[in-house]
Swiss-Prot record:
Protein name: Holliday junction branch migration complex subunit RuvB
Region (Head domain (RuvB-H)): 256-344
Class of this enzyme: hydrolase
Catalytic activity: ATP + H2O = ADP + phosphate + H(+)
Binding site for DNA: R311, R316
The UniProt record lists the keyword Cytoplasm: yes
NCBIfam families registered for this protein in UniProt: PRK00080.1, ruvB
Length: 344
């Protein structure tokens, strides 16, 4: 699933592209106005006091710039950043090694922080609160605990699932900021900026066409731009207009709403096999041969955001907009069923 062209999850091909396109200062960061203004205030206040920034939790769907914003914070504070992830920190000793090698003021960025084990979380609490590391030496009755002082640092945690964070961990973040899906205007600016960096000739309408199909996600927008650039180079003398962008994205099976074959297959399966719903999550997953978690975490959020599918106590139901988008006519029985489902 992560290899889908419109997947918001990072892919191996994204690494070099994102590094070259990533803004380095808040002034260059497009969109997320509320989060940007909030962080700007806290960063400036910390700089004026000569103190490390308070711990920051960034949450929201993948691909919206949590890693980028973390690097910007480190740049604005003029400190180094150490990057890791929840799954990579398997033991308490792994985290202890990272913490003891931080310099005063450094930023420690932990992606997917909700995937830290409870054992690792336990030594993170005093590190965040008291800038100290509690280490147990020995085992059994003879075991003793020693406390090591740590340099004052800033922890930035990123997660797509804030609800999975343990309350004691979440409560230790002084700054909590949610990143939202981008609007088309901001995405158009992002595409235009990326095209300029990549030296791609693109007009305003071409950038708008790519933005419109990018699912509100900068990572997807940059990836689509790269693919459209290749298509334009071979089929359209290299220049990207609205017509060229639309032609390229249709070729890559990304429709005007940003849906791909997998999205459309999910919607059409509910319509054709279950008369539009309601239908359970496990049944949907089996019908399209996908994992339940993939349907719930990867496919559904965007379809719900676009108003193409809804959740009811009785199961998932497609909306009239989905029928219209897919060009599937609704019979009276289906229309009546959808009206009844909307009451629950």
């Amino acid at each position: 699933m992560s290899d889908r062209l419109i997947s918001a999850t990072a892919q191996s091909e994204d690494n070099d592209l994102e590094l070259s396109l990533r803004p380095r200062r808040l002034s260059e960061y497009i969109g997320q106005q509320k989060a940007k203004e909030t962080i700007s205030i806290f960063v400036e206040a910390a700089r004026q006091r000569g103190e490390p920034l308070d711990h920051v939790l960034l949450f929201g769907p993948p691909g919206l710039g949590k890693t980028t914003l973390s690097n910007i914070i480190a740049n604005e504070m003029a400190v180094n950043i150490r990057t890791t992830s929840g799954p990579a920190i398997e033991r308490q000793g792994d985290l202890a090694a990272i913490l003891t090698n931080l310099a005063p003021g450094d930023v420690l960025f932990i992606d997917e922080i909700h995937r830290l084990s409870k054992a690792v979380e336990e030594i993170l609490y005093p590190a965040m609160e008291d800038f100290a590391l509690d280490i147990v030496l020995g085992k059994g009755p003879g075991a003793r605990s020693i406390r090591l002082d740590l340099p004052k640092f800033t922890l930035i945690g990123a997660t797509t699932r804030a609800g999975m964070l343990a309350s004691p961990l979440r409560d230790r973040f002084g700054i909590i900021s949610r990143l939202e899906f981008y609007n088309n205007e901001d995405l158009t600016r992002i595409v235009t900026r990326a095209a300029d960096i990549l030296k791609v000739v693109i007009d305003r309408s071409g950038a708008e066409e790519i933005a419109r199909r990018s699912r509100g996600t900068p990572r997807v927008a940059n990836r689509l731009l790269k693919r459209v650039r290749d298509y334009a180079q071979v089929r359209a003398q290299g220049d990207i207009t609205a017509d060229v962008a639309a032609e390229a994205l249709e070729f890559f099976e990304v429709d005007p709403l940003g849906l791909d074959h997998t999205d459309r297959r999910l919607l059409s399966s509910i319509i054709e096999k279950f008369n539009g719903g309601p239908v359970g999550l496990d049944t949907i997953a089996a019908a399209i041969s996908e994992e339940t978690d993939t349907v719930e975490d990867v496919l559904e959020p965007f379809l719900m955001q676009m108003g193409l599918i809804t959740r009811t106590p009785r199961g998932r139901v497609v909306t009239p907009q989905a029928y219209k988008h897919l060009g599937i006519p609704m019979n009276r029985e289906t229309q009546k069923g959808l009206e009844q489902n909307s009451l629950f």
